[in-house]
């Protein structure tokens, strides 16, 4: 659901970054849109996460925010990667537990996350055990859709034989 579809936006906070939109993970470029009191409260965290990005990040951010055309390409790229891996994982009994609007797959592995992740690592596939994200993440793994399409296809072939 879009925040624009919510009539009473009193408790709505929108975080928008270039991480997903433009595949600029790690640049920490984005914005928060919320009621003034919420934005004011969030400012207390600003010194902890930095005060201003480097100039090259600012320039790249301006270019990315100014160009909407590339966003469709980025979405299509992630969709192809998702469509390559997800059917294999579902066929092997894993359950998708996350949103479709992400550049990762959050999957219920039906058991402990670290041994599952270690098993995949032995075959060259790196996933994040859900336990790395806190106790509530136990039993899940995170497949980031950041490798190339060819690497996702190789991973799908490995997953078919390993799981």
Label every model-predicted segment.
Residues 1-163:
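PLP-dependent class I/II
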């Amino acid at each position: 659901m879009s925040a624009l579809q919510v009539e009473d936006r009193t408790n709505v906070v929108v975080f928008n970054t270039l991480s997903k939109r433009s595949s600029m993970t790690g640049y920490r470029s984005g914005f928060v849109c919320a009621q003034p009191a919420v934005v004011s409260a969030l400012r207390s965290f600003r010194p902890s996460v930095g005060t201003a990005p480097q100039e090259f990040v600012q320039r790249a951010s301006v270019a990315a925010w100014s160009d909407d055309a590339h966003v469709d390409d980025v979405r299509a790229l992630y969709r192809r990667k998702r469509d390559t891996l997800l059917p294999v994982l579902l066929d092997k009994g894993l359950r998708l537990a996350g949103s479709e609007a992400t550049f990762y797959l959050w999957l219920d592995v039906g058991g402990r996350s670290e041994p599952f992740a270690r098993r995949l690592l032995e075959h060259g596939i790196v996933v994040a055990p859900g336990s790395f994200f806190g106790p509530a993440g136990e039993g899940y793994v995170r497949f980031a859709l950041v490798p190339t399409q060819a690497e996702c296809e190789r991973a799908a072939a490995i997953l078919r034989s390993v799981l």
